[in-house]
Amino acid sequence: MKVSITRALNYFDIGMDYRITLGALFRVLQEASGRHSDDAENAMTATGKRWVLHRIAARIDRLPVYAETVTATTWHRFSRGFKAYREYELHAGDERVAAATTVWLYYDLDAGRLRKVPPDTGEKYGIVDECATGIDLEAWKPENDIASQYTTRITTRPTDFDPLHHVNNAVYFDYLLALLYRNGFDAGKIRTISMQYDRQIESGVASLEAACETRSAADGNTGIFKMYNDGTVFATGKWTEQSTS
């Protein structure tokens, strides 16, 4: 079963160029999966279970602009072992402007450990066997050894944290945007982006470092990044930019 939400972009969604920011784009997708998971999430919360985002990969063809109406669609692709796979598409009218593939872990809050995904998950969510991006997230091996060619210190805010006292998944993309902007990169050129959530940022973390390095390629520049603090890595990832040729 596919679930969609539609809304117009407002001033809180856009950046200085009137285009949707990376963080806002992923918040819109997050709203769609929240709608899909409302009933199941309530049952899970009552038993101390939660979905935890482990990996995400996205293709961005165009960043929608202020007042543009967008539709975010999501579906459950399948689950296996400790993991569930969820897909997303973002449309502006008939134009698909972005898509994402995600891997989620099933977590027992009371026991503080992962659990196998319940066998009736597919029945609850409905299964749609379509990959929105064509990206195999299981084959991706994130790089952790980054040269810190560019760095930015990030200060967390109370509004960054969700009811579980962790930084919200979409806020990591706000942190990435800060890293890119402060070091002279144009996030509007990004065409693919992947992130692995290595460890949750707890509410006691007042600040962290974001670092990246870039590499040139014939088909456009690429970059790898990480977010960390005092030897603890919170997230790692990569992006590719459109070619200027």
List PLM regions with ranges.
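Hot-dog-fold acyl-thioester-processing enzymes
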Residues: M1-L53, A99-V103, Y107-R191
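HotDog/MaoC-like acyl-thioester-processing domains
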Residues: V3-S4, R55-K141, Q200-G204, T214-S245
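Acidic/His-leaning functional-site neighborhoods
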Residues: I154-W239
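Small beta-barrel nucleic-acid-binding modules, principally OB-folds
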Residues: G48-L63, G188-Q200
